[in-house]
Swiss-Prot record:
Binding annotation for heme: Y358
An annotated GO cellular component: peroxisome
Gene: Cat
Organism: Mus musculus (Mouse)
Protein name listed in UniProt: Catalase
Co-factor(s): heme; NADP(+)
Key words, A-Z: Acetylation, Heme, Hydrogen peroxide, Iron, Metal-binding, Mitogen, NADP, Oxidoreductase, Peroxidase, Peroxisome, Phosphoprotein
EC identifiers of the protein: 1.11.1.6
Function: Catalyzes the degradation of hydrogen peroxide (H(2)O(2)) generated by peroxisomal oxidases to water and oxygen, thereby protecting cells from the toxic effects of hydrogen peroxide. Promotes growth of cells including T-cells, B-cells, myeloid leukemia cells, melanoma cells, mastocytoma cells and normal and transformed fibroblast cells.
PROSITE patterns: CATALASE_1 (PS00437), CATALASE_2 (PS00438), CATALASE_3 (PS51402)
Microbody targeting signal, short sequence motif: residues: 524-527
Principal EC category: oxidoreductase
Length: 527
């Protein structure tokens, strides 16, 4: 029976076999003191109380009480691996970034795949966007390309992100996933139509992590050695081929093997079947951006490939599993603001918001010195700055070097060649409403030209199967949005909803307790 077990199932057995010639280590406390008895607490007599001096117990229990760190507010369930990025095509005419320096150059990478809305223990096979984040360890510091498996997103303005995520997570009173919340937000923000359509298509449930594409999604800026800049988008297409899970199979796996994606990735790498992705860019000049028919920084839209073809750049290859999940995957922290010279942000509103949000959440989750954690450390660059101290400072704290700038003592100096590309700005400063920036044209193309008839049928079935659990007035708003995309799109979904609603009558409205009313009433009763 053991011969048929996969590497993930046999991890403990393999660990023992790798150490077969070694004697077991001496068991110690966290402070390195040898332990004589790990099976029995120290008591005053066989039936007496525990003694405070049992430091073996207190050392063990105190550490156990603090094992968990805050869960990621999104992308909590994930799998990670390590490998390299190899340049196969020259793009130095676009970017001076050292990661693209010459053909054949290899850069170490770390990758984390994830679902978005589920908790850490949730299933890998739910219908949910997938995170696909890549950390490049370059000589000019880390480059974190924090992407997804879709080239688009639900919203285009970062201020909506907390509310969007709240709507996808659990109801604040029932603590249940709530279709009313999900579809109410989507129906009120029709810019979500493109991503919603992608999500409920066949690609909404990838077959594990190896068989899906990745996208930087945002628009970025590339700058070459002459200071010339272009806008770009990043794509990484799976070399294993796109594979998706049918709804029934995904449901079965969610029950029988909720860690399906994690297991599949670990076993593939352990068996030498290294997954890879071909890396591409799209490029748009500043002049083209000015005359583009829509906002080129809009995260709810794609750049047409016929106008902006994919330019091959290199390969992402994953060939090493993590040695310890917590140390190397749970503590892995991606930050879109980590950009080496040659790669810069665009005015994309969602990207601009993420530049702040990601490092901020890492400082909360992992501490202010999270970049000293080995998996996050830019180990191929020398970190030299004026940041000091803070909880969990694990290095030499930059020794006796000056901790202020400027100074007269040969401490780190700024490098003019690292200056960002300059941008001229003479515009009004205000809160611009971007809600109605053509939310349907590209969705219509997706529905009528990208999908075939069978795929359209499954898309509408998937949407109706989820939307049916929302209230009727929310269903009506959602169907109107789909009808705006294409009459056939809305009509199919409405017909399916009519069947569902005939089987199960809907309440007209839910009543929610006003905030604080229960506690207020209880307080008055006690007066």
């Amino acid at each position: 029976m053991s011969d048929s077990r996969d590497p993930a199932s046999d991890q403990m057995k393999q660990w023992k076999e790798q150490r077969a010639s070694q004697r077991p280590d001496v068991l110690t406390t966290g402070g390195g003191n040898p332990i004589g008895d790990k099976l029995n607490i120290m008591t005053a007599g066989s039936r007496g109380p525990l003694l405070v001096q049992d430091v073996v117990f207190t050392d063990e229990m105190a550490h156990f009480d603090r094992e968990r760190i805050p869960e990621r507010v999104v992308h909590a369930k994930g799998a990670g691996a390590f490998g390299y990025f190899e340049v196969t095509h020259d793009i130095t005419r676009y970017s001076k970034a050292k990661v693209f320096e010459h053909i054949g150059k290899r850069t170490p990478i770390a990758v984390r795949f994830s679902t978005v809305t589920g908790e850490s223990g949730s299933a890998d096979t739910v219908r949910d966007p997938r995170g696909f984040a890549v950390k490049f360890y370059t000589e000019d510091g880390n480059w974190d390309l924090v992407g997804n498996n879709t080239p688009i997103f639900f919203i285009r303005d970062a201020i909506l992100f907390p509310s969007f995520i709240h709507s996808q997570k659990r109801n604040p009173q029932t603590h249940l996933k709530d279709p009313d919340m999900v579809w109410d937000f989507w129906s009120l923000r029709p810019e979500s139509l493109h991503q919603v359509s992608f999500l409920f298509s066949d690609r909404g449930i990838p077959d594990g992590h190896r068989h899906m594409n990745g996208y930087g999604s945002h628009t970025f800026k590339l700058v070459n050695a002459d200071g010339e800049a272009v806008y770009c988008k990043f794509h990484y297409k799976t070399d294993q081929g796109i594979k998706n899970l049918p709804v029934g199979e995904a449901g079965r796996l969610a029950q029988e093997d909720p860690d399906y994606g994690l297991r599949d990735l670990f076993n593939a790498i352990a068996n030498g079947n290294y997954p890879s992705w071909t890396f591409y860019i799209q490029v748009m000049t500043f002049k083209e951006a000015e005359t583009f028919p829509f906002n080129p920084f809009d995260l709810t839209k794609v750049w047409p490939h016929k106008d902006y073809p994919l330019i091959p750049v290199g390969k992402l290859v994953l060939n090493k599993n993590p040695v310890n999940y917590f140390a190397e995957v749970e503590q892995m922290a991606f930050d879109p603001s980590n950009m080496p010279p040659g790669i810069e942000p665009s005015p994309d509103k969602m990207l601009q918001g993420r530049l702040f949000a990601y490092p901020d959440t890492h400082r909360h989750r992992l501490g202010p010195n999270y970049l000293q954690i080995p998996v996050n450390c830019p180990y191929r660059a020398r970190v030299a700055n004026y940041q000091r101290d803070g909880p969990m400072c694990m290095h030499d704290n930059q020794g006796g070097a000056p901790n202020y700038y400027p100074n007269s003592f040969s401490a780190p100096e700024q490098q003019r060649s690292a200056l960002e590309h300059s941008v001229q700005c003479a515009v009004d400063v205000k809160r611009f409403n971007s809600a109605n920036e053509d939310n349907v044209t590209q969705v219509r193309t997706f529905y009528t030209k990208v999908l075939n008839e069978e795929e359209r049928k499954r898309l509408c079935e998937n949407i109706a199967g989820h939307l049916k659990d929302a209230q009727l007035f929310i269903q009506k708003k959602a169907v109107k949005n789909f009808t705006d995309v294409h009459p056939d799109y809305g009509a199919r979904i409405q017909a399916l909803l009519d069947k569902y609603n005939a089987e199960k009558p809907k309440n007209a409205i839910h009543t929610y307790t006003q905030a604080g009313s229960h506690m207020a009433a209880k307080g008055k009763a006690n007066l």
